[in-house]
């Protein structure tokens, strides 16, 4: 029975590949690091998961660390995320506006919901998407439960969050809030070129060499 359970466990799909350990050689010897730490050394923050309190804290900590290391050198945020919590979005968003360095945002794969706002919130002229990226915006949502007074409170909060989302997107796309309000009524999906036309990004890129991304860092 134990062997059968072990066999079934081994047959289950794995959530991720095993990350390789990168060996760095310096004058002081060799030391290992994971790819995310290596990227951080290059001032790259990689957001490749759902946006929740844990991932938001990770991103915020990295932004603050990189600012302390060099407040005048750009930071890059690479995004491949389905979105997530609105409060976690605002935490990262406010930190992006708070720190001194310019922040370049790059969509690789998808930037949906909260992640699309972070993509648009990069420094003007330094917001990019790879050519087959998918970007999605929509209104905030929440599940209401409890007494009628509780549901009423939650409904007011949803309206407040929606108003804030509309204002954020209007600021970073140059569109009017009423136009944003109509567009997020339902899921609105963009190709990379459509996202550029809408004002969510500044450039669609195929390679680093052929884009402003080469000089944005």
UniProtKB/Swiss-Prot annotation:
Active site residues according to the UniProt entry: 113 (nucleophile), 138
Cell compartment(s), UniProt: Cytoplasm
Keywords: Cytoplasm, Hydrolase, Protease, Serine protease
Protein name from the UniProt record: ATP-dependent Clp protease proteolytic subunit 2
Species annotation: Frankia casuarinae (strain DSM 45818 / CECT 9043 / HFP020203 / CcI3)
GO molecular function: ATP-dependent peptidase activity; ATPase binding; serine-type endopeptidase activity
EC primary class: hydrolase
Gene name of this polypeptide: clpP2
Complexes and interactors: Fourteen ClpP subunits assemble into 2 heptameric rings which stack back to back to give a disk-like structure with a central cavity, resembling the structure of eukaryotic proteasomes.
């Amino acid at each position: 029975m134990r062997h059968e359970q072990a066999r079934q466990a081994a047959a289950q799909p794995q959530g991720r590949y095993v990350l390789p350990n990168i060996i760095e050689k310096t004058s002081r010897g060799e030391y290992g690091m994971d790819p995310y730490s290596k990227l951080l050394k290059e001032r790259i923050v990689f957001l490749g998961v759902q946006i929740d309190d844990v991932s938001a804290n990770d991103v915020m900590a990295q932004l603050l660390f990189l600012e302390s290391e060099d407040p005048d050198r750009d930071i890059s945020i690479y995004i491949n995320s389905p979105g997530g919590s609105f409060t976690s979005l605002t935490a990262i968003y406010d930190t992006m506006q708070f720190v001194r360095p310019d922040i370049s945002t790059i969509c690789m794969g998808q930037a949906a919901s909260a992640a699309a706002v972070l993509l648009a919130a990069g420094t003007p002229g330094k917001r990019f998407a790879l050519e087959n990226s998918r970007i999605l915006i929509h209104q905030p949502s929440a599940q209401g439960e409890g007494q009628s007074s509780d549901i009423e409170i939650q409904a007011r909060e949803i309206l407040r969050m929606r108003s804030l989302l509309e204002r954020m997107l209007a600021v970073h796309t140059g569109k009017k809030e009423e136009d944003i309000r109509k567009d997020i009524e339902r899921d609105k999906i963009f190709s990379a070129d459509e996202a550029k036309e809408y004002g969510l990004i500044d450039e669609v890129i195929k390679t680093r060499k052929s884009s402003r991304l080469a000089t944005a860092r």
